[in-house]
Amino acid sequence: NVTLVAHRGMRSVAPENTTASFAEAGKHGYWGAECDIYRTKDGVWIISHDSHTYRMMDKSAFIEKKTYEELMDMNVDNGVNIDKYEDLKICSLEEYLDICKKYNMTPVIELKGKNNTEYYSEIVELANQFEVNPVYISFHIENLQTMRQLTQCKMYYLVQKISEDDIQDAKSIENCGIDFNGNKDKNFKSDIIKKCQDAGLELGAWTINEEDALQKLEQYGITLITTDCIEYAK
């Protein structure tokens, strides 16, 4: 009964947040693929966990200070099985949505930082073009509030440890759940999960890589699971 989301694509077999990792997630039958987005200097939405290219690319730059063409001059040079992927480039939001559509996978898009909220309509337009129904997630409640004015898609407020305030914030946005750190014991030591469920909030957990952690969450009725490596049983 578990709904599995591949964290940054299937990063256990291919470099994270790339066309390769998203395609692998699709081939392995994941319900969703999670990604992180930034906007380039010339207005192209691209996929990267970090605001700069230092960790994953062969040249270092801040994404929002470079044009898409400048970023395409770089290659991905880090990540699992990188040797298999020569000339792997930064992935655009369009490429990611195209892969999600091809594999009937739900796009799970993290709205990073607090910049560029005035351009969120571009994201919604792209999703509409590809006829996909994304889930939007963010650690910043304001980002979700802005996005809610543009789309009725499902949303989750990302938190480390669930607080009473988080419950109220999520409740203030229609069709918004809470996606919490499922490895933090404090989330299980109080009745906070029950309070979320009593408030009618859907819950998800991240980043779950151990089967026992998964089983614990299932006991609490939490079935939306973001993972680096857990797969559906063959």
List each model region and its residues.
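Phosphate-group recognition and catalysis centered on beta-loop-alpha active-site segments
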Residues: 1-234
